[in-house]
Amino acid sequence: MIPLSWYLLLSATLFSIGLIGFVIRRDLIVMLMCLEIMFNAVNIAFASFSYYNSNLTGQIFVLFSIAVAACEAVIGLAIVLALVRNTGINHSDEIVNLRG
């Protein structure tokens, strides 16, 4: 059986990659993808904790969290694509120009 520390190391690595990508990159779609990587890292940590505690409640929470993250990704992508299509703004630095 794989120890819990390996799963937590994987989760921390994925979260770090997502956080660094979110902070460094300015493209809105890439920022959304990095945010999803961070959500998946948290889900891996939740699932591994619930598996090692033999508690199905945590795994059910992970399934609901995946569903919420999927809805968030669809709504976020729709907003970003509408913003790009209507204004041509694709970088987070240019959003300041939208203020009226």
Curated annotation (Swiss-Prot):
TM helices/strands, residue ranges: 4-24, 29-49, 60-80
Major localization listed first in the record, in broad terms: membrane
GO MF entries: NADH:ubiquinone reductase (non-electrogenic) activity; quinone binding
Entry's localization field: Cell inner membrane
E.C. designation(s): 7.1.1.-
Keywords attached to this entry: Cell inner membrane, Cell membrane, Membrane, NAD, Quinone, Translocase, Transmembrane, Transmembrane helix, Transport, Ubiquinone
GO annotations of cellular component type: NADH dehydrogenase complex; plasma membrane
Pfam families tied to this protein: Oxidored_q2
Coiled coil: none
Gene Ontology annotations of biological process type: ATP synthesis coupled electron transport
Catalytic activity of the protein: a quinone + NADH + 5 H(+)(in) = a quinol + NAD(+) + 4 H(+)(out)
Origin superkingdom: Bacteria
Membrane topology: Multi-pass membrane protein
HAMAP family: NDH1_NuoK
Subunit structure: NDH-1 is composed of 14 different subunits. Subunits NuoA, H, J, K, L, M, N constitute the membrane sector of the complex.
Similarity comment text for this entry: Belongs to the complex I subunit 4L family.
Protein name: NADH-quinone oxidoreductase subunit K
The gene coding this protein: nuoK
